[in-house]
UniProtKB/Swiss-Prot annotation:
Record's keyword annotation contains Membrane: yes
Superkingdom of source: Bacteria
Function: Could be involved in insertion of integral membrane proteins into the membrane.
Keyword annotations: Cell membrane, Membrane
Pfam families the record matches: YidD
Family: Belongs to the UPF0161 family.
Protein name: Putative membrane protein insertion efficiency factor
Length: 90
């Protein structure tokens, strides 16, 4: 099931996404987030996390880093980018 979902997202990235102008306000992009979430948390939780991310991605949201969290969550991951910046500054 995991492979089927990842292949579906790859199909979207290859055939559908290029037709539209870039609109994702987060890094990584919503489709890459979906793939990472599926690979890290499994098909059901990953699909739920990816869908929640797509619903968060709109013109009125605050853009920025939103990495796949270590633990399952449907909310935006605010803490990890700050930790990453602290590690990079050392």
């Amino acid at each position: 099931m995991k492979k089927v979902l990842v292949k579906a997202v790859h199909g979207y990235q290859r055939w559908i996404s290029p037709v539209f102008p870039p609109a994702c306000r987060y890094y990584p992009t919503c489709s890459n987030y979906m793939i990472q979430a599926i690979e890290k948390h499994g098909p059901a939780k990953g699909l739920a996390m990816g869908t929640a991310r797509i619903l968060r991605c709109h013109p009125f949201c605050q853009p920025g880093y939103d990495l796949v969290p270590k633990h399952f969550s449907l909310r935006r991951n605010w803490a990890e980018p700050e930790k990453k910046e602290e590690e990079d500054s050392k």
